[in-house]
A protein has these predicted regions:
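N-terminal accessory segment detector
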Residues: 1-104, 111-113, 117-129, 139-163, ...
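Long, well-ordered alpha-helical scaffolding segments within enzyme catalytic domains
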Residues: 130-134
Length: 170
């Protein structure tokens, strides 16, 4: 850590976290658009799936280490970890129907989909990427966890009360 960071107040550090999250998402979007322009949507989505399969495990492991979430910590560990993802800084998320054996996780407000809607574009069809992203993230926390997509674009109900929904079960 640089001396500059050590001297910053909490409000400034929180603002920097917000900036870092926005920059991360902007880079992800620009990378995707560059591939899409060069090779088409199908290739861009396939490469995105490959990248998210690796990144989701890296992100989960770093969150686990930083926040003392044990490997095999079940749904409780996953709920905690989801709150520390970069997305949690950018999007409105909620948990529902929490039981000992499952819970639902919803992305109520999604920065990417909101921007597309404001530009008059159709929702980005992120379901095939999301299935890999959330499954790998959850199984990195605990391999017993199964992930089911409730809805995600291009599903027709996506964007009504939430953009995507996921059920995690043990």
């Amino acid at each position: 850590m640089t001396d500059q960071l050590a001297e910053l107040d909490t409000q400034t550090l929180r603002g920097m976290l917000d900036d870092f999250a926005k920059n991360w998402l902007a880079h992800d979007g620009l990378w995707f658009q560059a591939i899409e322009q060069k090779s088409g949507m199908e290739t861009a989505i396939e490469l995105d799936r490959q990248a998210w399969a690796k990144f989701s495990a890296i992100e989960a492991k770093r969150i686990m280490a930083r926040h003392n979430i044990a490997q095999g910590s079940g749904l409780e560990g996953l709920r905690k970890a989801l709150g520390f993802r970069m997305y949690a800084l950018l999007n409105t998320q909620k948990f529902a129907n929490v039981t000992d054996s499952s819970f639902e996780f919803y992305m109520v407000d999604c920065r990417v989909q909101k921007a597309r809607r404001e530009k008059g574009l159709t929702p980005f069809p992120c379901k095939s990427v999301g299935i890999i992203e959330y499954d790998v993230f959850a199984r990195t926390i605990d391999p017993r966890i199964t992930t089911t997509c409730i809805c995600c674009p291009p599903d027709s109900q996506a964007g009504e009360d939430h953009w995507c929904g996921w059920r995690f079960s043990i």
